Amino acid sequence: MIAYLISGLRRTLCLSLLMLGSVRSMAQETIDFSPDAPGATTGVDIMKQGKIDWETGIGLKWDRRNGEHARTFTINTSMFRLGLTPQAEVRLQIDECITHTPEGNFGGIANATIGTKIKVYEDGKVFPKVAFMGTMLIPGGSNAHYLPKHLGFQAHLLFENELSSKFTLGYDLGAEWNGDTESPDLFIGANLTYQPSERWSFFVESYNRYNSKRQDDWDKPGQDSHFNFMSEAGLAYKVSPRLYVNTFYDISFNEFSRYSNIGLGVAWLLN
């Protein structure tokens, strides 16, 4: 387990150094793009046709909700976005994690998805910009610790209003089903972004899930709930037109003192 952790850290560090080392050569670039990371909600912007974005990072999550006592380290999360047409992009994501519990340690692929984001409406002045995002969750085998046992799906409608030159309001409505539960979760999220300058941006968001069946892992021990209330805050800094760095921190309002998640990330326009 330690060797697996060290290997993941070494890989993430090498990739980060590679990206940071290329900043000087990219300083004169005028190309710009809009990363999706960070944040649990997703923006409406689509990658330009033929362009590839790589969004990667690490994270550490403490989870003691519902009597659990787990620490999960994301040693690498990678999202690749390819502009397929002027109206659509293809999205591939894979995450690797290690979890420590009092009963023992385990690790492996924590998330594997393929999906698309499609531009629906882009004027965004009187009416909000709109995009559709569809995702397929790839299942794991019988020995998988994180992946669902069955094929899962997510479908989201994404909206964005420009409130002013510095403030943007985004909201995200969707349904998510991992293939293992009786009914899908309804996802409702809202994101307020403040961009005081060309390089800096800050955001705060609320993202929540509702399930028609009460979930025992969404509440205190011995209790269950229809709702899972979460919140996240973070910032991003544009190092160059092709490279962004970001960080985030999120909490659970169901058991405020028993959950926290912090992460660092990089978004890089590869071509």
Which residues make up each language-model segment?
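Transmembrane beta-barrel domains of Gram-negative outer membranes and organellar outer membranes
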Residues: 28-271
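Bacterial N-terminal signal peptides that target proteins for export
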Residues: 2-13
